[in-house]
Amino acid sequence: MKEAVAESAVGYFSDNVEQFRSLYGTSQGFHERLEIWGRLLRRYSRPGGAAIDMGCGPGVFSFFLADLGVNVVGIDGALDMIQACEAQRAKRGLTNVRFIHGTLPDIDETTLEHADVLISSSVIEYIEELDETLALFARLVKSRGTLIISMPNVHSLSRSYQRLSNWISPRSDVYRYIRHFSSPRQLERRLAPYGMKLREALYYTHITRLARAMRTLRLPRRLTEDLFVGVFEKTAGN
């Protein structure tokens, strides 16, 4: 059953490669995501450093890091995504980024160097084996390195509505594959056994009618925004 769920999610993204690539250029919600993630990637990466992009999708953040001079490995379970990324890499003539086909959490760690920064944007909520995946991430981060992860916000009012409506009438889009919701502190508790400590968290949202309505209420962002990104540091000696 776990494999079937994973394959369904991977299949959905594989079937929509161009759609997800174009969203970063056309969708207000994806533009907001890129702006927030861009700030974090500039802050926590350095030229010549090593980065891993787990669940790289169409490679938006992998190429962003590569353009900053970072050595990047992008990994995704959708083969069509990887092929599209490799075509883009070849077209641009980049030598500091490469892409690997692999499904979480069954990644061959021996093929990867430990990373100064490991990122995973809107990926782990689809993975049944959440703790196993987080343990893998932590192992791949260097001591005092940085782990940046985004997940659906469990406190979001719009997410609560989505969960209820999906339970009443299952949706046909990507939301039906979501398995996990969290908060920054809940995620920190899951990562604590691996020496990871929360440094900062930012909230953002998909720009839907419901999200716009939530923002007009002037409630705390942890209630109005349906996604968060947490930045974790691996403490010395771990």
Question: What are these language model-derived features?
Answer:
Residues 170-186:
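Acceptor-substrate binding/catalytic loop of class I
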Residues 122-126:
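Short catalytic micro-motifs in class I SAM-dependent methyltransferases
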Residues 131-143:
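A short glycine-rich, Lys/Arg-flanked "PGG" loop and its adjoining helix->strand segment in the class I
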Residues 58-106:
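Class I SAM-dependent methyltransferase SAM/SAH-binding core
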Residues 119:
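A conserved beta-strand element that flanks and buttresses the S-adenosyl-L-methionine
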Residues 1-45, 48-57, 148-170, 214, 218, 222:
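Conserved class I S-adenosyl-L-methionine
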